[in-house]
Amino acid sequence: MFENFSPSTMLAIKKYAYWLWLLLALSMPFNYWMAQDSAHPAFWAFSLVIAVFGIGPLLDMLFGRDPANPDEETQTPQLLGQGYYVLLTLATVPVLIGTLVWAAGVFVAFQEWGWLGRLGWILSMGTVMGAVGIVVAHELIHKDSALEQAAGGILLAAVCYAGFKVEHVRGHHVHVSTPEDASSARFGQSVYQFLPHAYKYNFLNAWRLEAVRLRKKGLPVFGWQNELIWWYLLSLALLVGFGWAFGWLGMVFFLGQAFVAVTLLEIINYVEHYGLHRRKGEDGRYERTNHTHSWNSNFVFTNLVLFHLQRHSDHHAFAKRPYQVLRHYDDSPQMPSGYAGMVVLALIPPLWRAVMDPKVRAYYAGEEFQLTAEQSERPAAS
C-alpha cells in the first residue's frame, strides 16, 4: 500500500503515526471497560495479546512495506532539528507508568475474571511494557542528554531490567553477531535454548561492565557512582510501593509484567540477529559492524508502533542515529514479516527453522560451513 509513496509523503504520515503506540496503552482501559459487562471477562484480559500477535501481522501484510528513506542532505537535518520527536518518546514515560499503576489496581480489585483473567492481564501489561516501554527505553539510552538517559532508566526500572541500560550499549553493540554476544542467536538455536542464557548472561555482564567502568576511573564498584545500584533500588522501591498500595497481589502483578516484558525483549533480540555473523579476519578481529549484521523489516504498521526499531540494520551500523531518520538498505537481510509475526514464528521452532534457515543459507551462500549451532560457544558469565 505504501511502497510507491514518496519519501516526503511517508515522512509526513509517520510524523503523527508514531503516536500509534498509544493504541497499546489505551487498550488496557478499553479492555477493562469491555470486560465489566461481558459474559467472558477473561477474554478481554487476553485481548491485547491476541490483537498484537494475531491481528498485528495481518495489518503488516495489509499496509505493506515502507522502503522510503529521508534525503540525507535536506530532510535528515530537518528531522534531527525537531524536538517534537524527542518529546514524543518522553511522553511515553508518564503514560506507561500511570497505566502500570492503574492496571495493578484493576488486577487486584476486579475479581470477576479469576486467575485465568489475571494471567491474561499480566501478559497484556507486559506486552505493553515490552513493546512500548522497553522499545522507547532502547531509543533513549543511546542518547547523550541526561534527561533522555534518565527517562530510559525509569522505563527499564519499571520492568526490573536496568542492566539492559549498560549491557546493551557497552556489550551487545560491541559484540553483536559474534559468539561473544548472548543477545545474538546462533544458526540452528531455538528461542527456548536462547532465552535462559540471555537472561543470565546479560544480567551478570551488565554488572561486570559497570565494574570495569568504575575501576578504570579508580572508583569503588559498590559505591554511589554505580548506576545499576540506583536503578535496581528504584525497581525495589516500585515493588515495595506496589505491595504497599495493592498488597501481595500488586507485587505479583508488578513482577509478572516485568518478566513478560523482558522475555518479549529477549525474543526480539533472538529474531533480530538469528544466524547472522561478523566474519573474523586473519588477525583474529571481527569485521566492523554494518547493516548486514541485523535482520531488517520494513512492514510499516509495526515499524510505526515500535519507533522504527525494525530498521535494526541501520541502528547497529549507526547506533546514535535517532529513530525518525533510520534508513532501509536493500542489501540488508530482510525478514518475511514484522516483529509481531516473527515473535509468533520464533515460538514454534520447527516453523521458524523452515522459514528462516533457508534465508540464512541463501544470504551466506558459499559460507555455509560457518552456519553451525556448534559455533555458538558462549562466554563465561563472569
From Swiss-Prot:
UniProt remark on cofactor binding: Binds 2 Fe(3+) ions per subunit.
From the UniProt record, give one GO term of the biological process aspect.
alkane catabolic process
CDD domains of this UniProt entry?
A: Alkane-hydroxylase (cd03512)
| Residues the record lists as binding Fe cation 1 | H138, H142, H168, H172
Give the pathway annotation: Hydrocarbon metabolism; alkane degradation
Question: Which InterPro entries does this chain map to?
Answer: AlkB/XylM, FA_desaturase_dom
Q: Where does Fe cation 2 bind?
A: H173, H312, H315, H316
- Keyword terms of this UniProt record: Cell inner membrane, Cell membrane, Iron, Membrane, Metal-binding, Monooxygenase, Oxidoreductase, Transmembrane, Transmembrane helix
One GO term in the molecular function aspect is: metal ion binding
TM spans (from-to) = 10-30, 43-63, 90-110, 121-141, 146-166, 236-256
| Matching PANTHER family | ALKANE 1-MONOOXYGENASE 1
Record's protein name: Alkane 1-monooxygenase 1
Q: Which gene encodes it?
A: alkB1
